[in-house]
Amino acid sequence: MTTTRITLIGRPGCHLCDDARAVVEQVAGELGVGWVEQSVDDDPALRAQWGDHIPVTLVDGRQHDFYRVSPDRLRAALSRPAPRP
C-alpha cells in the first residue's frame, strides 16, 4: 500500500498548477510515493488559506513549495522518512 505523502493544492485552468502536477506525478512515480490533488474551488478553507499562493505542495502535511515545484527539492524532502502519526 502506498502512503500519501504529497498534497497538491491548485485549481482547474491554472497553468502553474499543471506544471506542478507534472513534477509531482514524475517524482511520486519515481519514488513510489502516493499523492492527492485538492482544488481551492471545492473547499472554502483551502481557498482562504492558499488561494493567493497556488499551486501549493505539502509534504507530510507541511508546506513544501508554492508557485513552482523543484523536482530535486521534492525528491530531497521525500528521501527523509515520513513522520510517525
Locate the predicted segments by residue.
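A short, hydrophobic beta-strand/beta-hairpin element that forms part of a small beta-sheet core
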Residues: P55-Q63
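Local sequence-structure signature of Cys/Sec-based thiol-disulfide redox active-site neighborhoods
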Residues: T2-Q26
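Compositionally biased, disordered extreme N-termini, encompassing classical targeting presequences
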Residues: M1-R5, A82-P85
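Short Fe-S-cluster ligation motifs
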Residues: D42-P55
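Generic recognition of short, well-ordered alpha-helical segments
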Residues: D19-A22, Q49, V69
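Non-catalytic, surface beta->alpha helical segment in thiol-disulfide oxidoreductase systems
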Residues: R62-P85
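Thiol-based oxidoreductase modules, predominantly thioredoxin-like and allied folds used
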Residues: V33-P44
